[in-house]
Amino acid sequence: MRFGKIEYLNLLPFDVFLKGYRTSNSFKSTCNYKKSYPAKLNKEFLFRRIDAGFISSIAGMNAHYKAKACKAGIIAYKEVWSVLVLESSPASDYQSATSNALCLVLDLKGAVLIGDRALKYHYDSKHTNSKSSHFQNSTLKHNKPSKYYDMAKCWYDKTGLPFVFGRACFHTNDTFYKNLIQDFNHKLGQGKRYKGVKIPHYILMPYVKKIGITKTFATKYLEHIYYKIEAKEHHALTLFYRYLRIKGIKAPKRF
């Protein structure tokens, strides 16, 4: 079994859960091997180089309608901090298909920035006096954070719904992956903000240092993210897919 994971801070609770989950060591090692950014995992999934994984919501559209998607994803309500559109020349982010599509759905103009790079950008914008503010990106030719939009907030303003940025989908081993995600949801507990998965200091700190943020900021960021897909999140996905059809935006394909 080959499971792919998005290598961002927002999936750290799942990583911690998986470490203590009763399954084979070979499966766990495969999960650590198949880690990358969303757009790369989309290709891995579409070409069946992985059996399952957390992939972009737009790439999971077929899985959504074919009952090949689990009830867990990477979800934000009102704010996300790590999916931004910067006031700059229009530019897509090579790491994400969903966020690029969402930018078009929301009629936003600017440069799309996602993941830990976007989180660092947001952090720097809130700490403009910090000496560590030295964001660099090939899309943007300046270091000083400019005005930007949080796409989860823009989506909420438009629909009143949360947004599902990524989703756990599978090709094979349906029962195993459904049980895995069901156990993950059960471990998390009830409510958006409550997480039954406690992240140890020694696991969190390497991410904090790598991104260039504080532990407090990282903890607050994770409070903006939740994972369980229920009726409202399912409706948000269906609405997003409807907007894609209206806008003529195609989901990623193998060829």
Tell where the protein language model's regions lie, with residue ranges:
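Domain-level signature for soluble enzymes in the chorismate/prephenate branch of the shikimate pathway
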Residues: M1-F255
